[in-house]
Amino acid sequence: YPLLPLSDLFAKAVHRAQHLHLVAAETTKDFERKYIPEEQRHSHKSSPSAFCQSETIPAPTGKEDAQQRSDRELLLYSLLLIQSWLNPIQNLSAFRTSDRVYDKLRDLEEGIFALMKTLEDGGSSQGFAWLKFSYERFDGNLSEEALMKNYGLLACFKKDMHKVETYLKVMNCKRFAESNCTV
């Protein structure tokens, strides 16, 4: 991320977050079609195993909540969510393009650091260091248990990338109040 105007940094970060969310959604859908019987798809989403680790952090849960938070908080939560997936994504064989997804996560992480630095935050995430966590690695086994675990992880990845996308869009809209600003 070379020295770009703040509006361009936000635009790039939002675009990358949207792309990652789309990839996560498509991968989850492909995984469902390939491995998960129709009747299990709906029951799994309400089961306790569908719980995502990110739900344990005090991050905003929706657009309205995100609008009440500072840019610093939203950037830190976005960074935390992205970093929690860096390790597990490397092992995701369901992504035929796991290298590219990992690279895109790293790129978005770098973009968020650039935003933090530009916003005079210095890129420090010290205030949230105690919140660090990482998801389990994806299981390469094709047993039913492993498939359901991977399905849950994919659902969490999709949900977390949607959160990052929402946080970045909210910040972009607050700062630049574009007429076509939708979150």
Swiss-Prot record:
Biological-process GO terms, alphabetical: animal organ development; growth hormone receptor signaling pathway; positive regulation of growth; positive regulation of receptor signaling pathway via JAK-STAT; response to nutrient levels
Domain of life: Eukaryota
UniProt region (Disordered), positions on chain: 38-67
Annotated Polar residues bias: 46-56
Primary subcellular site in the record, as a coarse category: secreted
SUPFAM superfamilies per the UniProt record, alphabetical: 4-helical cytokines
Binding residues annotated for Zn(2+), in chain numbering: 19, 165
InterPro entries: 4_helix_cytokine-like_core (IPR009079), Somatotropin (IPR034975), Somatotropin/Prolactin (IPR001400), Somatotropin_CS (IPR018116)
GO terms, molecular function: growth hormone receptor binding; hormone activity; metal ion binding
Protein's name in the database: Somatotropin
Recorded name of the encoding gene: gh
